[in-house]
Design a protein with these regions (language model features):
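Long, well-ordered core segments of solenoidal/helical folds
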Residues: 23-41, 81-99, 128-147, 176-195, ...
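An alpha-helical repeat/solenoid feature that recognizes helix-turn-helix modules
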Residues: 2-24, 47-81, 97-125, 129, ...
Length: 323
């Protein structure tokens, strides 16, 4: 089985961040550890930045943020066996809580990372055909348009959640059923500006659904020269004067999520010239909090594990290319 995309991406980021000075790495390491709850999971934002390193009261653990906490630690090559053992009980307690596509992918990624770090197999008690059972569960999210919805009740496909399902199939080593229908669904989400939208009624493309669309198309070897040129043209339009990428052409500021996904898409399309590496680096570094963690944008006042990963991820990709 080919090495899954998510793990290849983690390795690219970690390779770049290995060039960073130890003091900066440790500052963000300590921030990430401070966001872990007593039950072993990680929670989202809700703490003012000045209290970010204090006890995270009132912030429940969540599979989505737990996966980002693990990804951040892995990016720094600091997801230790001790860290993994602290996470394992939370994952064991949430193994059947898979109401959304995000829950499924977040749990599976986290469980595989725990197994790699400790040897603890959270699927040891599952039946031998659990990959096929999980694949059947994933098909419960499939919509009539060929894509995948956020929940089982969803009526129309989501570009982002379709990408997550494609990643999940790769993680479990199963073939996604009727891939041509998924590719056609993704193509239907492209708009005249060259980018892609999240759901069908939308007219204006977004950086993040465009990145998700290219992710799906890349996994299925469906990126041709015309599509590449269209998407690169769109990404050039959403470059910000700050050095990063905007969420869409009407949002007047860059954010770290859009910058991470936009820059990753440029790299995956073998195009580095759209961004100025120095300005990109300066923008992301400006989002650091002095005590660790990254904010979403220059206006933001809070840090969390998700946006910390986007900050680390962008720097890791940038430095893996330049150093």
């Amino acid at each position: 089985m080919a090495h899954p995309y998510l793990f290849r991406l983690d390795e690219r980021v970690a390779r770049g961040l290995s060039h960073w000075d130890p003091t900066s790495r440790e500052r963000h390491h300590q921030f990430l550890l401070s966001q872990q709850n007593p039950d072993g999971g990680f929670g989202g934002r809700g703490i003012p930045v000045e209290y970010a390193n204090e006890e995270p009261e009132g912030r429940d653990s969540d599979l989505y943020y737990t996966a980002f906490g693990i990804r951040g630690l892995a990016a720094l090559k600091l997801f230790t066996s001790q860290d993994a053992r602290r996470v394992a009980p939370f994952l064991e307690g949430t193994r059947h809580y898979h109401a959304t596509v995000i829950d499924v992918v977040s749990w599976l990624y986290s469980a595989l990372m725990v197994q790699a770090a400790t040897g603890i197999d959270l699927l040891a008690q599952a039946s031998a055909d659990w990959p096929q059972e999980l694949a059947a569960r994933l098909e419960g999210f499939r919509s009539s348009d060929g894509g995948y919805s956020k929940t089982h009740e969803g009526a129309i496909g989501s570009t982002y959640h379709s990408f997550l399902v494609a990643l999940c199939y790769e993680l479990i080593g199963q073939r996604l059923p009727e891939p041509d229908k998924l590719v056609s669904f993704i193509r239907s989400r492209q708009r005249d500006d060259g980018g892609f939208v999240e759901i069908s009624p939308m007219k204006r493309s977004g950086t993040n659904p465009t990145a998700a669309a290219i992710g799906v198309m890349t996994l299925h070897s469906a990126v041709g020269p015309n599509l590449r040129d269209d998407v690169l043209g769109y990404l050039a339009d959403v470059r910000s004067d700050e050095g990063g990428f905007q969420a869409n052409s009407r949002i007047p500021f860059a954010d770290s999520l859009s910058t991470f996904t936009g820059y990753l898409t440029c790299l995956d399309l073998n195009e580095k010239a759209i961004t100025d590496p120095k300005r990109l680096e300066e923008f992301i570094l400006s989002l650091q909090h002095p005590t660790g963690g990254f904010r979403a944008a220059t206006w933001d006042q809070s840090t969390d594990v998700e946006y910390t990963f986007y900050g680390l991820g962008t720097l890791g990709l940038l430095w893996s290319e330049s150093k």
